[in-house]
Amino acid sequence: MTDDPISPSMALLPAGLRDLLPPDAEHEARVVGRLMKEFTRHGYERVKPPLIEFEEGLLSGPGRALAKQTFRLMDPISQQMMGVRSDMTLQVARIAATRMPKSPRPLRLSYAGQVLRVKGTQLRPERQFGQVGVELIGGMQVEADAEVVLLAASALAAVGADGVTIDLTVPTLVPTVCRALNLSEAETRCVRDALDRRDTAAVAAIGGPAGDLLVRIMAAGGPAAAAVAALSAVDLPTVAEPDRWRLTEVVKLLTAAAPHLNLTIDPVEQRGFEYQTGLSFTIFARGVTGELGRGGRYRSGGDGEPATGFTLYTDTVLRAIPGPPPPRRILLPHGTPYAEGARLRDEGWQTVAVLEPGADLSAEARRQGCGHLWAGGRIQEIQDRP
């Protein structure tokens, strides 16, 4: 305790950072625990990477795509630059490559933790938020792609998310097509910008076979079944066939395993998939602003081991599920034997002990947010509870 007055400035936090208060902090912890339990049920084992790593390791390889979002600081001990993680996926990939290289493949790992980014976005102004996810490392099969999509759907269902849509994409498709058509770097940048804006006229303005083909690819989006049919009718360059084949096969597996899963396809989406190397996906929920998570295929470690996985964002997930139920809090009068309180806690009650005699117990129960009172060896409900 301190006698120093509390300055109003002490309540100010940097932009994009916030305190999570009761009951929301407890609710978040329970939701994260339920998600992790679902991952464990599917054979994924938890790892825990550090919050800060040396910059050289954190931002090497695919990590270069995250450099602009990474806070940096000098380590006073080693005098080397360090980075605060802005994403946990590549940390888990590093663990697989350096700590578990001899573990049997495919390797299934899960994780949960906080990340910090230099800037927020329009849809996610928070700069610190929680990530919960899995990585399946060492599996190139289409079954691996389908497994992580189905796990994301089942984990969200386990915490009560409703109206979930999974939007599939192949962020390597458009770059592959542009290279096959011998488009220049400047033309490819124009294509990417136009596709990001969903500007069909700008794409068509490229002209020639390239413009026509890219417009057809762009138009082949929507519900999965129709999108696969439309994309199959497009005359793609031979080098782009593997991307289309994988997308088609994964949709078949997902449709067979979960026919009621709401699947869509956006074959030209690339934003946010800077280090993905194949089939990827974004997760949305009806009525919720922003994405619940995203995932996809990438190359893990220095040897480029094939991997896929997904990350859920806890702040958005919490907006997509029911709020916390009212707590079962009971007030214990001063002097209540410890054993009685222990028995109530074993029965699922949250006990709040009165620390001094003489209190108005009903008033104290209301003040402490308790809906019940332990009196005379019985549980009494408080009327006009808070």
UniProtKB/Swiss-Prot annotation:
One Gene Ontology cellular component annotation held by this UniProt entry: cytoplasm
Q: Does the keyword Glycoprotein apply?
A: no
| Signal peptide bounds | none
List GO molecular-function terms, semicolon-separated. histidine-tRNA ligase activity
InterPro entries, sorted: aa-tRNA-synth_II, aa-tRNA-synth_II/BPL/LPL, HisRS-like_core, HisRS/HisZ, HisZ
Compartment(s) of residence? Cytoplasm
> Which keywords label this protein?
Amino-acid biosynthesis, Cytoplasm, Histidine biosynthesis
Q: Give the record's pathway.
A: Amino-acid biosynthesis; L-histidine biosynthesis; L-histidine from 5-phospho-alpha-D-ribose 1-diphosphate: step 1/9
Name the residues that span the membrane: none
Q: Which GO terms describe its biological process?
A: histidyl-tRNA aminoacylation; L-histidine biosynthetic process
The answer to keyword Cytoplasm applying to this record is yes
Query: What more does the entry say?
Result: This function is generally fulfilled by the C-terminal part of HisG, which is missing in some bacteria such as this one.
Instruction: Please give the HAMAP family that the UniProt record associates with this protein.
Output: HisZ (MF_00125)
Quaternary data: Heteromultimer composed of HisG and HisZ subunits.
**Function, in words:** Required for the first step of histidine biosynthesis. May allow the feedback regulation of ATP phosphoribosyltransferase activity by histidine.
Q: Which family does it belong to?
A: Belongs to the class-II aminoacyl-tRNA synthetase family. HisZ subfamily.
Q: What is the protein name stated in its UniProt record? A: ATP phosphoribosyltransferase regulatory subunit
This chain's source organism reads: Rhodospirillum centenum (strain ATCC 51521 / SW)
From the broadest rank down, the organism's phylogenetic lineage runs: Bacteria, Pseudomonadati, Pseudomonadota, Alphaproteobacteria, Rhodospirillales
Recorded name of the encoding gene: hisZ
